[in-house]
């Protein structure tokens, strides 16, 4: 079986990578190998056509490859909440915990991330 992730260096996919590398799947009787497939859309297409069994990705990305969640099932979460960081210019004087500093500001985000931020 193959598990694909779109990068090997960010913390985004660490749980999936660690599960393979530290033998979690083997202990469960599964022979799973890790494969790097970039971009994520290619990994989702490979899973759709049956050439791999698992994709480690953010849950919100699945709808890009499987509209309306057809023919795909979310097995587990790699993280809770949204693991992205909101960063601001230092000259704005933002202090930890002060959400008022974002009032009236524009926040830029990639399409699928933006959908998640709106939901929050």
Give the ranges of each region predicted by the language model.
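Pocket-flanking alpha-helical
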Residues: 17-20, 35-73, 84-96, 117-119
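A local structural motif
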Residues: 1, 24-36, 51
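Bilobed "Venus flytrap"/periplasmic-binding protein-like clamshell domains
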Residues: 2-28, 84, 90-120
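Short beta-strand/turn micro-motifs at beta-sheet edges
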Residues: 25, 73-74
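Active-site nucleophile and cofactor-binding loops and adjacent substrate-binding regions
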Residues: 9, 36, 77
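Short beta-strand elements of ligand-binding domains
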Residues: 76-78, 111
